[in-house]
């Protein structure tokens, strides 16, 4: 199962999930000038980053909005990035946060688990209910795909909805967690984790630890590290026996070159060093 591949990748390479949230403004100017289109500039920037970090990060998260913003050329860069990750046998999470139901959800599943935009995992928004998740289940069962469903996110606005009390006196995120957990029991691998995981931000540690203790075989995609205030020590509390989650960093790695003199010329090396430092920081806390 795909979750076992991710588990093994964490064991071997550490917990870093490198976010390829690539804006054209992140691409060093001199490197960008080598290419005649946004598509080529973004893809080749991503390719250099991937080549430099493949052995030190567990997976890559590709946020589709950064590519959609540039229209067809951006989506071609997105497609080529996912293809290159498959070629390199790297695990790709398509950060699409889809949340529709029925036939529309079927089409989203087909779009992102097959064809041009094929990825290993996708992120989903559960707000419309489980009938927005069920159309993805055949891909989990038959094609070894996986999901990360928004549970307790790292943004400030999480309090607007996720903390609303239900009739049973629980927070909305508690109820969502229970439903995700129950659904995930159908997709548990040899690692004892499920291919239906959750997005749990590391900016509210008490709740994160509570979720970890309650849902022991739920694998976490953990945003909020670094720029949003999450630390390696806090991240370690979300893990079980050194595994059970990957920690996303995007700008902290992609833009690491900006901290170095003449870093634009070695942006890929700077990204590699930033990923290694992040990996080692997390490992020290385990």
Curated annotation (Swiss-Prot):
Signal peptide: none annotated. SUPFAM superfamilies: Ribulose-phoshate binding barrel (SSF51366). It comes from the Bacteria. The keyword Nucleus does not apply. Keywords: Decarboxylase, Lyase, Pyrimidine biosynthesis. Pathway: Pyrimidine metabolism; UMP biosynthesis via de novo pathway; UMP from orotate: step 2/2. The active site is at residue 97. GO terms for molecular function: orotidine-5'-phosphate decarboxylase activity. The keyword Heme does not apply. GO terms for biological process: 'de novo' pyrimidine nucleobase biosynthetic process; 'de novo' UMP biosynthetic process. InterPro entries: Aldolase_TIM, OMPdecase_AS, OMPdecase_type-2, OMPdeCOase_dom, RibuloseP-bd_barrel. It catalyses: orotidine 5'-phosphate + H(+) = UMP + CO2. Its EC number is 4.1.1.23. Pfam families: OMPdecase. Belongs to the OMP decarboxylase family. Type 2 subfamily. This is Orotidine 5'-phosphate decarboxylase. It comes from Clostridium acetobutylicum (strain ATCC 824 / DSM 792 / JCM 1419 / IAM 19013 / LMG 5710 / NBRC 13948 / NRRL B-527 / VKM B-1787 / 2291 / W). The lineage of its organism: Bacteria, Bacillati, Bacillota, Clostridia, Eubacteriales. The gene is pyrF.
